[in-house]
Swiss-Prot record:
EC number of this enzyme: 3.2.2.27
InterPro entries the record matches: UDG_fam1, Ura-DNA_Glyclase_AS, Uracil-DNA_glycosylase-like, Uracil-DNA_glycosylase-like_sf
Compartments (UniProt record): Cytoplasm
GO molecular function: uracil DNA N-glycosylase activity
Stated name of the protein: Uracil-DNA glycosylase
SMART domains hit by this protein: UDG, UreE_C
Gene designation per UniProt: ung
Native source species: Staphylococcus aureus (strain MSSA476)
Chemical reaction(s) catalysed: Hydrolyzes single-stranded DNA or mismatched double-stranded DNA and polynucleotides, releasing free uracil
GO cellular component labels: cytoplasm
């Protein structure tokens, strides 16, 4: 199974013309993130056959030079967003990795699908592209991963992500969940949750190579 087949199946099942028309207008008349060519970067960097872990985000960062198509990741020269800083703090506490760069392309290449449930956003307006159709598309992506893969780790931070559990066959996949790494909630159970070592322990238990969460040149 490849993304091209899954995309074909989804777009055959659902009509995304209204969303397509909306996005054409938005990209023509407003500043929208990420750049058009990066909307699907999560799928470009993580082929379907390589998926070991799915980390669900919400919508892209809405500031300049941030979003580039991977959930939680920002472009190499951007400032660290607070949630990502907390993710790295937990990573250091969990398995001793100290990451210096704010982009997560190496995770994506390791097999971590960094999937936002909404893939575009208008500059400075969080959730501005909610309910235009992306949720339908990404729900189908989650279901496809659940249906066609085995032994994938789904990392679900915060209530919106955890609402997606209903799309996942928990009998053949691993669910790791906690509060969101946002500064508003991280101290209520994200810190100390050890998602990275738990994910690797599960992967190794089913005969898969663990994720290299530490800094990579990739």
């Amino acid at each position: 199974m490849e993304w091209s087949q899954i995309f074909h199946d989804i777009t055959t099942k659902h009509d995304f013309k209204a969303m397509h028309d909306f996005l054409e207008k938005e990209y023509s008349t407003a500043i929208v993130y990420p750049d058009r060519e990066n909307i699907y970067q999560a799928f470009d960097l993580t082929p379907f056959e390589n998926i070991k872990v799915v980390i669900l985000g919400q919508d892209p960062y809405h500031g300049p030079n941030q979003a580039h198509g991977l959930a939680f990741s920002v472009q190499p020269n951007a400032k660290f967003p607070p949630s990502l800083r907390n993710m790295y703090k937990e990573l250091a506490d969990d398995i001793g990795c100290v990451r210096q760069t704010p982009h997560l392309q190496d995770w994506a290449r390791e097999g971590v699908l960094l999937l936002n449930t909404v893939l575009t956003v208008r500059q400075g307006e969080a959730n501005s592209h909610r309910d235009i159709g992306w949720e339908t598309f990404t729900d189908e992506i989650i279901k496809a991963v659940s249906d066609y893969k085995e032994h994938v780790v789904f990392i679900l931070w915060g209530k919106p992500a955890q609402q997606k559990i209903k799309l996942i066959d928990t009998s053949k996949h691993c669910i790791i969940k906690s509060v969101h790494p946002s500064p508003l909630s991280a101290y209520r159970g994200f810190f100390g949750s050890k998602p990275y070592s738990k994910a690797n322990a599960y992967l190794e238990s089913v005969g898969k190579l663990p994720i290299n969460w530490c800094e990579s040149e990739a």
